[in-house]
Amino acid sequence: MRIVFMGTPEFAVPSLKRLFEEGYDVLAVVTQPDKQRGRGMKVSFSPVKELALQKGVKVLQPESVKNNPEFLQELKELNPEVIVVAAYGKILPEEILTLPEYGCINVHASLLPKYRGAAPINWAIINGEKETGITTMLMDKGLDTGDMLLKRSIAIEEDDDAQTLHDKLANLGAEVLSETLKKLKEGKLIPEKQKDEEATYAPIITKEMGHIDWKSPACRIRNLIRGLKPWPGCYTFYDGKMLKIWKAEVVEHFGNEPPGSVLKSKDELIVKCGENALRILEIQQEGSRKMGIREYLIGHNIPEGTILK
């Protein structure tokens, strides 16, 4: 089967690897343009491009996929039977969606129609879901609205964060893609329409979302910490300095102190929330490294009764 693969970040790498391992004819890889990163503004390639170059596969990096006749012509000349899309990062126009014989198949990191959009992994954790999964679907003009092909679920563990769940789903995505393509070749797939009335959305994550509102229940703040790790991270302010909180656990507390109050700070750090409290386990002060809370408290004094902002 002749395939063009479209993807950009780490999430897409296991799916592309699986195509190579299973001997598919990967005609080309389409990925986002190179970016300049770091203080030296060095050009860095996307993880998908790195893998494609290792395998000697043609790489296409259009600035835009819409109103781009040159790119469209390149795709037509490649003549793929199917286009596989995994976290590519751009919306495809209809002339690309209808080009391959079998259409464009997307590997999406949620159990559609729940969590359509850019950040399904983060939002599943933020919202306290107990399971999520992978859906492969036939792409249409909408945002993750196409007919579903296969679904596989996975439990969200209590200690999962967005990074650990991302890695699990990236690997599961490769498995589900493999099964989808096999069944596609055998004519054994029956596309299933999504129930739009059951749809929920997973909008893009912003840095501002990480600012902790201590009036929220402790369980909700803990889910936010997990859902925004490693980027952008959750933070609060003490004495004008940002404190990033990377790990915490809920503790029962029925006092009436103001939310954000430091309840204990001798050898552990417990902060009052709108409901219950949080025991902070990993912290990072602005300009410093991440550390366990005991190590942090040896060198930093946060008096009990202090209110974190």
Swiss-Prot record:
What sections of the sequence does the record tag as coiled-coil? Answer: none
> Which amino acid positions bind (6S)-5,6,7,8-tetrahydrofolate, per UniProt?
S110, L111, L112, P113
The signal peptide stretch is none
Question: GO cellular component terms?
Answer: cytosol
EC number of the protein: 2.1.2.9
User: InterPro entries from the xrefs?
Assistant: Fmt (IPR005794), Formyl_trans_C (IPR005793), Formyl_transf_N (IPR002376), Formyl_transf_N_sf (IPR036477), Formyl_transferase-like_C_sf (IPR011034), GART_AS (IPR001555), Met-tRNA-FMT_C (IPR044135), Met-tRNA-FMT_N (IPR041711)
Named from the GO MF annotations, one term is:
methionyl-tRNA formyltransferase activity
State the NCBIfam families in the record. Answer: fmt (TIGR00460)
Can you name this protein?
A: Methionyl-tRNA formyltransferase
User: What is the species listed in this Swiss-Prot or TrEMBL entry?
Assistant: Caldanaerobacter subterraneus subsp. tengcongensis (strain DSM 15242 / JCM 11007 / NBRC 100824 / MB4)
Q: What is the lineage of its organism?
A: Bacteria, Bacillati, Bacillota, Clostridia, Thermoanaerobacterales
Write the gene name: fmt
